[in-house]
Amino acid sequence: MNELARLSSEIGTDVLTISQGMGLDSRIGPQFLRAGVGYGGSCFPKDTIALLNLAKRHGVNLSILEKVREVNATQPLWFLEQLHKQMPDLYGKRIALLGLAFKPDTDDIREAPSLTIMDALQRSGAQIVAYDPVASNHVKELFPDAEYTSTPEAVFQGAHAALLVTEWKECVELDWAKIMEMMEVPLLFDGRNAWPARGSGIFLSGGWKKLTTPLQESWLFLLAR
């Protein structure tokens, strides 16, 4: 689905509609058909490596599984490429990250996409401000120069862009009218297809393209929606 999301972003289609259509086929089902910034944790990375090593020992080429790992490894960087397209020079820009754990309801940051994203942002000279309800202290050991907030709303203050990396409930259910006023530039990147896209008065349906609302000029960049 992540590769289809990349294609969808180029041709203006809705990857959610594609996944819903695929999920209607009983041979496939709707589970695990969600595009995003990539999986992490201790299970999928470890298990896929173990299976590949087993196959290699027996002379079997698991090319699809190798591609899965390749796409997953590059997905966070592809996500950041969309930010660079709108803001080529990130030096000194205040970039907000919402969610640091590899998934909601855990403080596990092993193989978390947020780490790849933060490393790339740091190399670009961006000022990183991040929020996670339970994982911030773990990430702070790796990125001590980043700023960490105690509330999700606080990361938006003066931000030039905001990236949803982990779809914690408190990172999704926000007062968007207030958020728009807090940001220096209302540039939003949804890495989990979790932020509202329709009916809020702030966001319009669309994809990786500039959107204009009746209230103010703002942008919502959903993951190939």
Segments from the language model and where they lie:
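Structural/interface elements that position substrates and couple domains in central-metabolism enzymes
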Residues: 1-216, 223-225
